[in-house]
A protein has these predicted regions:
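Sigma70-family region 2
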Residues: 27-28, 54, 65-82, 100-102
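Amphipathic, Lys/Arg- and hydrophobic-enriched alpha-helical face
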Residues: 38-56, 73, 144, 189, ...
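Internal acidic/polar
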Residues: 4-8, 12-19, 104-130, 164
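Short, Lys/Arg-enriched C-terminal cap helix and immediately downstream tail that follows
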Residues: 2, 99-100, 152, 187-203
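N-terminal module of bacterial RNA polymerase sigma factors
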Residues: 1-44, 145, 192, 202-203
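Helix-turn-helix DNA-binding module
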Residues: 57, 138-153, 157-178
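Short, charged helix-capping/linker segments at alpha-helix termini
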Residues: 12-13, 27-36, 46-65, 176, ...
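Arg/Lys-rich amphipathic alpha helix in sigma70-family domain 2
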Residues: 73-76, 88-109, 133, 196
């Protein structure tokens, strides 16, 4: 799949040069322009899908489904941040897979490390040794997975993808106050889940 997705807000995927023009060409049916957009944002989309699904094969499926949907819908794109529009489609594709999986008999949980893109440093993390980072990321991924779906999505979008509250609210079609509450409760729950590994996250 794609390279590891964005690590911190400073490393967020930036818009393509002349992205508005590329989008316009894609919307008019230019497949090369559309492929250029998808290649540019592939890592971000896969990273989001993986963190919502925690399964590399399902994340790949969700990303592919999102790109197919985006190809069909790009003609109706009406502006705004293209990255957020595409990530919203990716999140919806991931939720569709989750809903289908819930209707099937349960299967063994995948290894938390399998196919995992490298997690961005959350705001409260200050790793004090390079050797501890792998273990730290593992515990973070497992803890994120234990959050309720709405809290996990909000925390991932805000603390991993660097979106502000307004962007998260727009992307998840939620009220601003609801988003703030989800992020606050999600962060508190993460602290509780990671309390026994406190030495990994403090300097």
């Amino acid at each position: 799949m794609a390279d590891a997705p964005e690590r911190t807000p400073a490393h967020r995927t930036q818009p393509l040069p002349d992205e508005v023009a590329v989008i316009a060409r894609a919307a008019s049916g230019d497949r090369t322009a559309f492929a250029q957009l998808m290649e540019h944002y592939q890592s971000a989309c896969y990273g989001l899908a993986w963190r919502l699904l925690h399964d590399p094969d399902q994340a790949a499926d969700a990303t592919q489904d999102a790109f197919i949907h985006a190809y069909k819908a790009i003609g109706s794109y009406r502006g705004g941040i293209f990255r957020s529009w595409l990530l919203r489609i990716t999140a919806n594709a991931s939720y569709d897979i989750l809903r289908r999986a819930q209707r099937r008999p349960s299967s063994p949980l995948p290894d938390p490390d399998e196919g995992a893109p490298e997690l961005a440093d959350l705001a409260a993390i200050n790793p004090h040794a390079e050797a501890m980072k792998s273990e730290m990321y593992r515990h973070l991924e497992v803890a994120l997975r234990r959050l309720p779906e709405d809290q996990r999505t909000a925390v991932v979008l805000c603390d991993v993808y660097g979106m502000d509250y307004n962007e998260v609210a727009a992307m998840t079609s939620s009220a601003l106050g609801t988003v703030k509450s989800r992020i606050h409760r999600g962060r508190l729950r993460l602290r509780e889940l990671l309390a026994e590994h406190r030495e990994l996250f403090t300097g």
